[in-house]
């Protein structure tokens, strides 16, 4: 005997090119992440509990959408999204380029059929995806070869669109483009799917972060009637790296906050942006990468071993309905710095994340005063002394008094070697 147990979920949904996403008649901005099934020292071979942990991390963050990318993943991922009410899109691995053969076309169509039939009964699935950045690695740049390549890619796309709509007319289709809209327009790919997904990295791979919102507005104007989602965005963030003058490609926690704050604010301003999936839930192995950590793409809001970065707390504070108070830089518990005050202290900034209106920070039982929360966090200039420093944050939301504490060991270095108050001990 063989047995299949299917979940039952009753819901109705729709996408609108002007007003975004609606679930059971209520407007919902989809905010979430993409995800690779990758883990520290384990690669892709994960036990069920690690898959479960990832979906719980997304739920805890306040995310309501998971882009299962760029391939169907373990069934336990889908099971958890069904149980936790997380909207999902699932896609087949047709990524970066096509092979101009009928065998490639046939295989792609078969993958699309298998994907839909595998997860057809999943109530969490509302989008089927089938191409990601398909012109990122074009083998040709001009002439007849490029024209033929475009024509074949369009043929594959239309075959996949038709296949998915025939297999499942109740759900939406989506294709994810990269930041070269002209390529996709020339091949007519912007016309085909029901949802346009845009992978945008202005302020990271592209220099001007403000080009992000200009591209959103252009897409909304040019592709009238098309639903728009931001399917990828995000900078690399190494939790070991900090900067008090954050800038593009420094991989600092601080630039990660600057970037994500800008993107989230711009997307929330625009009701026509139906949703977004930041890249990525977790850091993941990528052999060709030569970033802050070799062979690792560290755009995740959590690390390979799932330690939470500051950008995770930023999103949790922005998206959660529960009262939140968290002192940031939690992994940076052993610090050092040069004396920069007359009181023989070293001032360094520390973010405090909260959805309260204001927060008060105490350092070694001395108040640094209260600060208004702006864009989900307040930044305090903390005067560290040598040795152990106790940070305590206090905030009030309604009837809830919130507290968070963090102990930091600080190595104070004199501004001059002859400073008797801060004796020189090490290089």
Give each language-model segment a name.
Residues 2-368, 372, 381-384, 390-402, ...:
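Extended substrate-binding grooves/exosites of carbohydrate-active enzymes
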Residues 393, 404-427:
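Non-catalytic C-terminal accessory domains or segments of carbohydrate-active enzymes
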